[in-house]
């Protein structure tokens, strides 16, 4: 089956993060699973500004190294990159994120077969106030929205990709570790109709 998706229907997730930053005051923005930091650089150059601090957690040492090199070219960007493993989430105590932090992930948990039960609790504890926006494909874990959801589930099972994001998120909310603020099972119409993005917005207690 072929579905042609016009480019103009594509929703830019980074603009979504920039908008979120404009609705509240934050000391820093943190991306977990940042690769070489391209999303953080886009945020900086498209409205994030110089007063915000930028942090990127990445599993690969090459990604962390490249992000640091790129950040060193921009003297006005206060950026710091560090190792982060979704399977064993922890943060160095020397990392100072400030008092109010916006965290986000974007299709980085999708290939982690199972995140641990404490993932949300650990992330929520990095600052006095944490809001997190997860842009991950988890809608099919909650509800069958049609043929795409069915194929989506089959694809993830075949590849050994994540199947427990939604259940772990619900448990964290039920346990009082976090407060879920909003969620969308499918986020508009991306250019990849067979791997649609879902969005979860939650904050620390």
Positions of predicted regions on the chain:
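A short glycine-rich, Lys/Arg-flanked "PGG" loop and its adjoining helix->strand segment in the class I
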Residues: 118-130
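Conserved Class I S-adenosyl-L-methionine
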Residues: 147-173
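Class I SAM-dependent methyltransferase core
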Residues: 31
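Conserved glycine-rich SAM-binding loop
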Residues: 35
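Class I SAM-dependent methyltransferase SAM/SAH-binding core
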Residues: 38-88
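Conserved alpha-helix/loop element of class I SAM-dependent methyltransferases that forms part
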Residues: 4-25
């Amino acid at each position: 089956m072929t579905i042609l998706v016009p480019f103009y229907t594509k929703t830019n997730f980074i603009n979504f993060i920039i908008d979120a930053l404009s609705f509240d005051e934050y000391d820093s923005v943190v991306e977990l699973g940042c690769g070489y930091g391209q999303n953080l650089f886009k945020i900086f150059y498209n409205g994030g500004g110089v007063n915000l601090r930028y942090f990127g957690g990445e599993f690969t040492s090459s990604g962390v190294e490249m992000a640091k090199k790129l950040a060193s070219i921009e003297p006005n960007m206060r950026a710091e990159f560090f190792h982060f493993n979704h399977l064993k989430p922890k943060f160095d105590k020397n990392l100072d994120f400030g008092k109010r932090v916006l965290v986000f992930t974007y299709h980085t948990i999708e290939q982690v077969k199972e995140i641990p039960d404490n993932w949300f609790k650990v992330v929520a504890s990095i600052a006095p106030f944490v809001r997190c926006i997860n842009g991950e494909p988890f809608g099919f874990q909650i509800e069958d929205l049609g043929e795409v959801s069915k194929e989506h589930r089959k694809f993830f099972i075949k590849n050994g990709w994540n199947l427990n994001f939604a259940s772990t998120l619900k448990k964290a909310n039920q346990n009082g570790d976090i407060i879920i603020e909003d969620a969308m099972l499918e986020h508009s119409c991306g250019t990849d109709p067979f791997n649609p993005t879902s969005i979860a917005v939650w904050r620390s207690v």
